[in-house]
Design a protein with these regions (language model features):
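A glycine-rich beta-to-alpha transition motif near the start of alpha/beta enzyme domains, typified by
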Residues: 63-90
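Conserved phosphate-binding/catalytic region of the ribokinase-like
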Residues: 203-296
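Glycine-rich phosphate/adenosyl-contacting loop at the front of the ribokinase-like
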Residues: 1-65, 76
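Hydrophobic anchor at the start of a short beta-strand
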Residues: 3, 63-65, 88, 162, ...
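Gly/Ala-rich phosphate-binding loop of Rossmann-like dinucleotide-binding domains
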Residues: 58, 156, 263
Length: 296
């Protein structure tokens, strides 16, 4: 069984600030905000939600099929996917754009300030989900706005169950659009902040959202996960990390585990437990695709 992973392929530039943002930003001066952070360390990684989720799913033994767009500078990413044994058959190159780029600054409390250039990602609507016998599952992760809308409709038309994972793109949709996403999807996953925004915009609380799908999974950081099914919440405890080094990509690592469990017919609670475990391993390593994990 293969899973289509709709989302971005991106290059991440990750910088670490050896202080606290809260000590540099004055709340009463936000109207004239002008700050600069000295970042002694800088690293460039392969990233993007589709790439990160595919990496996690592949580590676990699944079959990811990322559906994404890259730019004229994306050849090295194709080489990366080939080296990992991940198919790029649904990856399209946009010659007049750059691959999406994320600029991330993390402070000592693991707070992050991000800048994101979408580049070729905004052309992801040029890719298309179609029914195929080996494709049994999908996920819509943060991607170009039009692509997310079209892919949700295409998954539904192809009768492929999928996870709706709006992430940082959630603010780009209004309440009616988000309600439609929920109604088309089979599962929804968000972090606690995104969950509050999703509830605010749809007018549905977590219990109500869970009644429209087979399950709602809410990650709550160091506290683990909440699984909502038919209005009933189950808490899935966190796994203590060996070290807290870099949160970048933890949510995507979790979602790869979620897909693996769904591919194998697991309960959502078991999926969430694996997600917590993989996330705890990822956070102990720098970068979204530099950790190792095995179910053996």
């Amino acid at each position: 069984m293969a899973s289509i992973i709709c989302g971005s392929l991106a290059f991440d530039t990750i910088m670490n600030f050896e202080g606290k943002f809260s000590q540099q930003i004055m709340p009463d001066q936000l109207h004239i905000l002008n700050v600069s952070f000295l970042v002694p360390s800088l690293r460039r990684d392969f990233g993007g939600c589709a790439g990160n989720i595919a990496y996690s799913l592949k580590l676990l033994g699944g079959t990811p099929l990322p559906m994404a767009t890259i730019g004229q500078d994306g050849g090295v990413y194709l080489e990366r996917l080939a080296k990992l044994g991940i198919s790029a058959e649904f990856v399209r190159t946009i010659d007049d754009a750059y691959t999406a780029q994320a600029m991330i600054i993390t402070d000592v409390d693991n707070n992050q300030i991000n800048g994101f250039h979408p580049g070729a990602m905004e052309q992801a609507w040029q890719t298309r989900v179609s029914a195929r016998s080996d494709i049994r599952l999908g996920i819509i992760a943060p991607d170009g706005r039009d692509a997310m809308v079209q892919h949700a409709e295409q998954f539904a038309a192809a009768d492929i169950p999928f996870v709706f994972d709006p992430g940082q793109q959630l603010p780009r949709f209004d309440g009616a659009e988000l309600r439609k996403f929920v109604e088309l999807s089979t599962w929804v996953t968000v972090n606690d902040y995104e969950g509050k925004m999703l509830s605010d915009r749809t007018g549905w609380d977590n219990a109500e959202i869970s009644r429209h799908v087979k399950g709602l999974i809410v990650t709550i950081g160091a506290e683990g996960s909440e699984v909502w099914v038919d209005g009933v919440k189950t808490h899935v405890p966190a796994v203590t990390a060996a070290a807290v080094v870099d949160p970048t990509g933890c949510g995507d690592a979790y979602r790869g585990a979620l897909l693996y469990g769904l591919e194998n017919g697991w309960s959502l609670e078991r999926c969430a437990a694996l997600g917590n475990q993989v996330g705890s391993v990822k956070i102990a390593q720098r970068g979204p695709q530099n950790y190792q994990f095995s179910l053996a």
